[in-house]
Amino acid sequence: MTQPAILVLEDGTVFEGESVGANGLSVGEVVFNTAMTGYQEVLTDPSYARQMVTLTYPHIGNTGFTDQDDEARKIWAAGLIVRDVPRRPSNWRSQVALPEWLQARGVVAISGIDTRKLTRLLRQKGAQNGALMAGDIDVEKALEAARKFPGLKGMDLAKVVSTESTYNWKEGSLDLNSDSFLGLGALNIGKSAHASAGSGEELAFKVVAYDYGVKLNILRMLAERGCDVTVVPARTPVAEVLALQPDGVFLSNGPGDPEPCDYAIDAIKELIAQKVPTFGICLGHQLLALAAGAKTLKMTTGHHGANHPVQDLDGGRVMITSQNHGFAVDESTLPANVRVTHRSLFDGTNQGIALTDAPAFSFQGHPEASPGPRDVGPLFDRFVDLMAARA
């Protein structure tokens, strides 16, 4: 027997449907994602912490879930909003259906609502705070909860979703033929620069990755390029990172507002001063810009999808990218030593920067995809090239 569920927005709009997840009450910022596939990767992306994800594609759950496609060890999204959930998933890799997967992880979710109407409302008014309630329904209680939610502006969530302890990562991408993950340096890119003299062996690049909410596929793409990755908590002092003598430092994706992350901004300033090769993605991109002296701004609806066109301003190439962010770098505030490398063809917002006086660059979207295209994957190779040039 199905349980009732409601979505209540801060403006008083109420959507009634049925529960396809856990019972209870959850609050957060309601956003929409336009990707047709990859719902598991979306839900397990830590960048969605304190956000409720509306998936605009009508049928969600067709291919079920498999543990191999998780992008984090925990679900940080505040809830899921969909139009329809197929009764029976069909895929040779599927281990469990959507409702069972959500219930096991305690995620509140609603189906059977008009997601087109909701998406148009969010597009017109901007991201809304909302409350999802499943099981025992109380509209007034849900509305009160939605209006009490403070919103993401000014909210530092990187320290919330970050790992609590340092760990090492050497696992590459998934090989479906062998049903296993590739090992360190599987792509054999750029490692010759680190061949030990006379040994005939190629050594991996030592990369320290600041975890602000890192996706696992980012770590895999670094590993298969010959990077021996040490993942550290978001608030790790930069002195501890430099003591590891890394060839490069990676700044991960993550949720929330970048401006309150003073600990990260201060650390990145020192990395810039020390000329350490540095590569940032998503939140890491915004933090690099802040460390360089720029400012960020809250977007009306943000970018959430897997089909966003971005232009590489250096070569003129247009790439289709995966995007997931609600804040953006304000190009008008970039200092003279920072040049723009990429720009969105949807709304003209900044998508990439590079410092002219330090080996540091960043990209707003997700070159690791998961889900989405890998048109921007060569940025990982650029990071390897920076480290090789410094060796």
From Swiss-Prot:
Residues 206-391 form the Glutamine amidotransferase type-1 domain. InterPro entries: Anth_synth/Amidotransfase (IPR050472), CarbamoylP_synth_ssu (IPR006274), CarbamoylP_synth_ssu_N (IPR002474), CarbP_synth_ssu_N_sf (IPR036480), Class_I_gatase-like (IPR029062), CPSase_GATase1 (IPR035686), GATASE (IPR017926). It comes from the Bacteria. Pathway: Amino-acid biosynthesis; L-arginine biosynthesis; carbamoyl phosphate from bicarbonate: step 1/1; Pyrimidine metabolism; UMP biosynthesis via de novo pathway; (S)-dihydroorotate from bicarbonate: step 1/3. GO terms for biological process: 'de novo' pyrimidine nucleobase biosynthetic process; 'de novo' UMP biosynthetic process; glutamine metabolic process; L-arginine biosynthetic process. Composed of two chains; the small (or glutamine) chain promotes the hydrolysis of glutamine to ammonia, which is used by the large (or ammonia) chain to synthesize carbamoyl phosphate. Tetramer of heterodimers (alpha,beta)4. This is Carbamoyl phosphate synthase small chain. It comes from Xanthomonas axonopodis pv. citri (strain 306). The gene is carA.
